[in-house]
């Protein structure tokens, strides 16, 4: 089986940075324990990234995943997830007697602060994203009153837009660039003027999606590897499938639909921004063995 593997597949800068910060806390805790000091408890606030294998590995190291601020105990070292958290939660975390390490992706943090600045200037946010995604919940916390979220142009068309309101447009950092531009054009037509835009979709997302599209146009089938909870991975699968090629999204090689793939001559392989290289490698080896 011939496999074309995306060069952009695997960890992005934000994920790598978040995991390095968490690893550093784990290493420091182990060093202190080796010196005879009590081992401090390490936790993340929410899953550090959206990948089940990575989360399982950290759980095996004793890293806890907290969901509520009141779960934080004195002396805990708490690492904020790569997706960021609502600013009210971050403030509450920092009020606890704990060490708080912010592992929010720099691109997400920039989006948070940009949204806050626009809202302070009197504009109202229109956010293209998944309403229940943790990054989106965090972004909205910087937006104040009146912010509106939409996950598609169809949803945008159904929003109660007010002609007298000064809007600005932003997106979840891992959103589909093409769909974002369609939304931007629709707003221009609907409101009769260009809406100010925050360019919050990160370059890594844009490059990954474009490479997935390019590969999908050359192959008989497309395999996208990454957590089912990962929004950026789901969108890679979406943009690949939109090219008319059979596309499958799996978390590891054991989930591959072997019989459907066996007759393919060329298979494309890409992966989400939170997928470890080891899983991508294992998937590639399995595909090449078919």
Curated annotation (Swiss-Prot):
Keywords: 4Fe-4S, Iron, Iron-sulfur, Isoprene biosynthesis, Metal-binding, Oxidoreductase. CDD domains: lytB_ispH (cd13944). Its cofactor is [4Fe-4S] cluster. It catalyses: isopentenyl diphosphate + 2 oxidized [2Fe-2S]-[ferredoxin] + H2O = (2E)-4-hydroxy-3-methylbut-2-enyl diphosphate + 2 reduced [2Fe-2S]-[ferredoxin] + 2 H(+); dimethylallyl diphosphate + 2 oxidized [2Fe-2S]-[ferredoxin] + H2O = (2E)-4-hydroxy-3-methylbut-2-enyl diphosphate + 2 reduced [2Fe-2S]-[ferredoxin] + 2 H(+). Pathway: Isoprenoid biosynthesis; dimethylallyl diphosphate biosynthesis; dimethylallyl diphosphate from (2E)-4-hydroxy-3-methylbutenyl diphosphate: step 1/1; Isoprenoid biosynthesis; isopentenyl diphosphate biosynthesis via DXP pathway; isopentenyl diphosphate from 1-deoxy-D-xylulose 5-phosphate: step 6/6. [4Fe-4S] cluster binds at residues 12, 105, 202. InterPro entries: LytB/IspH. Signal peptide: none annotated. (2E)-4-hydroxy-3-methylbut-2-enyl diphosphate binds at residues 50, 83, 133, 173, 230, 232, 274. Its EC number is 1.17.7.4. Isopentenyl diphosphate binds at residues 50, 83, 133, 230, 232, 274. Binds 1 [4Fe-4S] cluster per subunit. Dimethylallyl diphosphate binds at residues 50, 83, 133, 230, 232, 274. This is 4-hydroxy-3-methylbut-2-enyl diphosphate reductase. Catalyzes the conversion of 1-hydroxy-2-methyl-2-(E)-butenyl 4-diphosphate (HMBPP) into a mixture of isopentenyl diphosphate (IPP) and dimethylallyl diphosphate (DMAPP). Acts in the terminal step of the DOXP/MEP pathway for isoprenoid precursor biosynthesis. The gene is ispH. Pfam families: LYTB (PF02401). Belongs to the IspH family. It comes from Nitratidesulfovibrio vulgaris (strain ATCC 29579 / DSM 644 / CCUG 34227 / NCIMB 8303 / VKM B-1760 / Hildenborough) (Desulfovibrio vulgaris). One of its GO terms (molecular function) is 4 iron, 4 sulfur cluster binding.
């Amino acid at each position: 089986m011939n496999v074309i593997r995306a060069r952009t597949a695997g960890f992005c800068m934000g994920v790598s940075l978040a995991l390095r910060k968490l690893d550093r806390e784990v290493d420091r805790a182990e060093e202190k324990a080796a010196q005879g000091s009590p081992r401090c408890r390490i936790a993340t606030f929410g899953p550090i990234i959206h990948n089940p294998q990575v989360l399982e590995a950290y759980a095996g190291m004793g890293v806890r995943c907290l969901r509520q601020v009141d779960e934080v105990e004195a002396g805990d070292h708490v690492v904020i997830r790569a997706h960021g958290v609502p600013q009210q939660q971050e403030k509450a975390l920092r009020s606890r007697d704990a060490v708080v390490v912010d592992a929010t992706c720099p691109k997400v943090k920039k989006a948070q602060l940009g949204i806050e600045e626009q809202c302070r200037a009197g504009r109202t946010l229109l956010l293209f994203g998944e309403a229940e995604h943790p990054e989106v919940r965090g972004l909205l916390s910087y937006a104040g009153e009146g912010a509106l979220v939409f996950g598609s142009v169809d949803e945008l068309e159904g929003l109660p837009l007010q002609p007298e309101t000064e809007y600005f447009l932003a997106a979840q950092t891992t959103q589909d660039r093409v769909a974002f531009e369609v939304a931007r054009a629709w707003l221009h037509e609907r409101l009769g003027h260009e809406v100010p835009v925050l360019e919050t979709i990160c370059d890594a997302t844009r490059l990954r999606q474009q490479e997935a599209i390019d590969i999908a146009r050359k192959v008989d089938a497309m395999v996208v590897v990454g957590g089912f909870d990962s929004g950026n991975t789901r969108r890679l699968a979406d943009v690949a499938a939109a090219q008319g090629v059979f596309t499958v999204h799996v978390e590891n090689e054991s989930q591959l639909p072997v019989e459907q793939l066996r007759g393919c001559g060329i298979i494309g392989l890409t992966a989400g921004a939170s997928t470890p290289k080891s899983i991508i490698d294992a998937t590639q080896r399995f595909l090449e063995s078919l």
